[in-house]
């Protein structure tokens, strides 16, 4: 994998991470309220670890599957699904957090 391709893939993973983090932040604010700073901080810290792992997993798989001859098509496809992947990551984490007790 070329450095250029690695940089492009990193940019996609960062987009996914940012979108998923925003969705989780909104979910926590709505579900738990903004006044529970300690709980919020801990849950967000946990989420960041999970999101980071998901982004790393995505990167690892994408690097393993990359075919240099169709890189541009693959990158375009991945970019098309960024929102979908972020939503999937976020909804899995929301299930982990569970409803407000």
Report each predicted region and the residues it spans:
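Solvent-exposed interaction surfaces and binding hotspots enriched for charged
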Residues: 1-101
């Amino acid at each position: 994998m070329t450095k250029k391709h690695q940089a492009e893939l990193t940019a996609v993973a960062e987009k996914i991470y940012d979108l998923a983090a925003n969705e989780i932040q909104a979910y926590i604010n709505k579900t738990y309220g903004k006044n529970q700073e300690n709980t919020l901080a801990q849950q967000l810290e946990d989420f960041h670890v999970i999101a980071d792992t998901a982004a790393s997993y995505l990167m690892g798989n994408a690097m393993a599957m990359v075919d240099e001859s169709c890189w541009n098509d693959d990158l375009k496809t991945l970019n098309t699904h960024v929102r979908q992947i972020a939503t999937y990551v976020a909804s899995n984490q929301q299930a982990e957090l569970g409803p407000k007790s």
